Amino acid sequence: AWNYSYADAFVILKYTFTNATEDTIQDIYAGIWADPSIANFNYTDIYTPGGGFSWYDNLNGFDETEDDAEFKRDIAYQYDTDGDDGWAESYLGMSALGSNVPYNYLNTNYFQWVWTNSNNSDYPAYSMPLTDEERYDKMSSSVPKGTGPDYTSEGYPAAENSWMFLLSA
């Protein structure tokens, strides 16, 4: 994204929100939805290793750990679980880097769901929002973490699929 080798693998987006009315906005959340589809899109021969539609073997997560300076990472991410035999070893991560609100007070939320799945019977809490009210609910809180063999050690679904995610604050 930049003209320097040390900075060629990221993009920073800056958004400005303006209240065009005299009313005070209450309880606002801003979010960005992503369909990362981590896969090799340049190699599509389905009969060759790494080819075909290979984005149905992805997993998502949300890194809430702190670095050495006690700065929360809050990174939503997706990766290809098997790397498609070397053809799709990439990943994608997104984080809210700041706002007019000091970062210590910025509450970052994370949600995920399967592509086109508004009724996820395997993971009922991980369903796609369909209405404005459902979208607001998803942006105002994080998805509940699960335990057991159906979940990763971080508490997110362990079933590979074409997962979407929503990062909001």
Model regions: which residues?
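C-terminal substrate/ligand-recognition segments
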Residues: 165-169
